[in-house]
Amino acid sequence: MRLKIENAMKELKETIPFRVRFSEVDSMNIVWHGSYPLYFEDAREAFGRKYGLGYYDIFDNGYYAPLVELTFKYKKPITYGMKPEITIIYRYTDSAKIVFDYEIKDSTNGELLAEGHSVQVFMDRNYQLVWANPEFYEEWKKRWQD
């Protein structure tokens, strides 16, 4: 029987502020839906830098981590000039994938504006799906156990 370590892992998250640019809004002055994946990408990159699970860390170990699932839900409009913040939260899984949840909040009052979820899988250098956790990823998870 394999022991789950989900509850034994530290909560890994990162929060970054961002400014809504004019090029990211539609004619109603509301953030265009296509901008949200970019905000999530910025959060994933910040998380990777902070915790040592960035794209180059993955590449340097001989793998790619393509995004295979991305969802988001709008709660309140985000408009031009706002300065929200996005929090990315790592979600442990035994599977060979990287799972994140996201929350975008108004930095002035903490109100939830949007939330999302993403899943990345591992592929080897021959673009073949990897079904077992790569060794470096298992080691990374162990590093963050309580």
Each model region followed by its residue ranges:
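Hot-dog-fold acyl-thioester-processing enzymes
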Residues: R2-L67, D124-D146
